[in-house]
Amino acid sequence: TLAGVEVLRRISAQYNGKPPVTVRVVDWADEEGARFGKSLFGSSACSGNLDMDEARGLVDQDGIKLPDALQKVGIDFEKVKDCGKELEHAAAYIELHIEQGPVLLDRNLPLGAVLGTFGVERHAITFHGQAAHSGSTPMDRRKDAFLAAARMSPEIYKIAERSGIGVCTIGSCTTKPGIVTSVVADCRITLDQRHLERDKLATMHAEAMEACKRFASEAGCTVEWERLWHIAPAPFDPDLVNFCDDAIQETCGVSHRLPSGPLHDAAEVCMAGVPTVMMFVQSLHGISHNKIEDTKEEHIAMSVEALDRLDESDQPDELTIDEADPDTLGGTGDATDDDAIAVAEAEEDELDGLLNALTQ
């Protein structure tokens, strides 16, 4: 939030409070899905991609439904998609974010230009074998579902390596009957696959399915797949990526282009048809969502400077910005409906931030 505000302060000072375009800072609601388990809630409502039926049934850990929580603060859930009008004339969207990974750290670089966000194929895979006594069943007579599932672990590393920049993760594994004296009858694993290119993501998925069938057959088992979630890759605007790369090089002397494995609000804005780019700041330890998550202050300062440079290079003849705090930020109200919109994104998990984003 502060980075976007600082950029707007510079713009306001440069144009004596009357910039030629409107620039807004948007504070998206519940990117992480922290309260209701639905990621990208605010941005998906704005992009029009929010599944209203699904969101209507979301419940927090206290049993409160999302529509009821919104109603308590005066927001009609059935109208949340109305905020999509804020993107109707948007010319550009810029988002600054920590990398949440080790790529920039390993290269000893403070900042990076983001090529886009990975598409995701997420499935539950269940291998079906036969329960049998662990003592009386010879090894060559077993139909061990866990054996078939376990063979997938090294295989997904080969699949990811063949794809180039793709990643594959088996994140969970459960067995039945789950007792020490029985061969595993059923083994369920979850597989998360991600890639920036749609075709390569499809290839990774097809290779994983083929491997599962092969390993199941070799173990005397069967296998079934259940899609848990899918989202297409969101490649960012090439011109904006170039501008971002230039701004970083002007600030730091060197830049690096990388994809984003995690999803971000920028993906929703991009899929809504708005030219989009992200800038990453190095994460210390290459770790996020952990108590040791941190970023160097000097890198944060560089990111604000680079964001400011990017905003200058990206401004069209006329421009609009989404205001998180109209009393603080630039923008004169002189812009017309044909104005462009450049948005510097700020991350906030509290519901108040979500509601603010939806109602601005």
Model-flagged regions — what are they?
Residues 169-179, 190-196, 222-241, 261, ...:
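A short beta-alpha structural unit
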Residues 53-54, 194-198, 228-230, 286-299:
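Short beta-alpha connecting loops at secondary-structure transitions
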Residues 185, 255-305:
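Zn-dependent metallopeptidase/amidohydrolase metal-coordination segment
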Residues 200-204:
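Solvent-exposed, non-transmembrane alpha-helical starts
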Residues 315-360:
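Intrinsically disordered, low-complexity acidic segments enriched in Asp/Glu and Pro
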Residues 115, 133, 137-163, 205-210, ...:
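His/Asp/Glu-rich mid-to-C-terminal helical/loop segments that flank catalytic regions of hydrolases
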Residues 30-31, 35-199:
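Midchain, well-structured core segments that form catalytic/ion-binding scaffolds
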Residues 16-22, 80-84, 136, 157-170, ...:
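Flexible, glycine/charged-enriched surface loops at secondary-structure junctions
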